[in-house]
Amino acid sequence: ISVCELYGKLREDKAYRRHPGSLYRVFVRLGFRKKPESTKKKSKHTGTYDTPTSIGEKWQMDVKYVPNACYSGKDGQKFYQYTVIEEASRKRFLYAYEEHSSFSTVDFLKRAILFFGYAPGILQTDNGGEFTHPSKTSRIHPLDVFCNRYRIRHKLIRPRTPWHNGKVERSHRNDQERFYNDLRFYSFSDLQTQMKRYLYRSNNIPMAVLGWKSPNQVQKDLSGR
């Protein structure tokens, strides 16, 4: 369990009101976590980014390869995690697939719209084949067909600039630490079940960038419900 997650549980269940930094220092003092030496390099990407303040303005979508080490099967099957993040609240939807393809992408977007209860104004993705065709072809990608039908603007980031999809990229790093590092599953349906539980958990973890509220809390505040 992370300090952020513990902080959220203490605040909700025990009315804890001290700053999360105090809780982190207690963790370090008790030896549960060592203070890492600073290895952070200055970012080369200093441009500003305007995060939407209203839900439904913009989603980021990406796909993550599920590590082989998590799967106890012997058939060599591969699995993929599709992710969409609501930029304004950081609330996410995840779903597992056995392939990353245009079919999986469109199916996932349909499921995401049902999960959130609305479609985004803008859907931002990278230039992977599951999201777009090469620029040299005149064919229309199935994702673009779907987006055009529902008046969603499909925005592609520039090639080799993953930081432009930074929110969903960072969330995948958190998934590795909080979920995949300790995950063991024996079948595709088992992966789906465990991922569903993890999705509920992750959307309830407070985040510093959200003023120590969880994505679910911010989503509720912004939707007025």
Q: Model-derived features: where do they sit?
A:
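Active-site beta-loop-alpha junctions of metal-dependent nucleic acid enzymes
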Residues: 77-78, 94-118, 122
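An active-site-proximal beta-strand-loop segment
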Residues: 61-93, 103
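Short, solvent-exposed loop/turn segments at secondary-structure boundaries
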Residues: 72-73, 96-97, 133-138
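RNase H-like two-metal-ion nuclease catalytic core shared by retroviral integrases
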Residues: 126-127, 137-147, 154-177, 193-196, ...
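C-terminal domain-tail junction helix/linker
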Residues: 150-152, 174-225
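Acidic/histidine-rich, metal-coordinating catalytic segments
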Residues: 100, 118-135, 158-160, 212-215
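Basic, flexible linker segments flanking DNA-binding modules
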Residues: 1-59, 63-66, 141, 218-223
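Mobile genetic element proteins and their domesticated derivatives, centered on retroelements
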Residues: 6, 23, 62, 84, ...
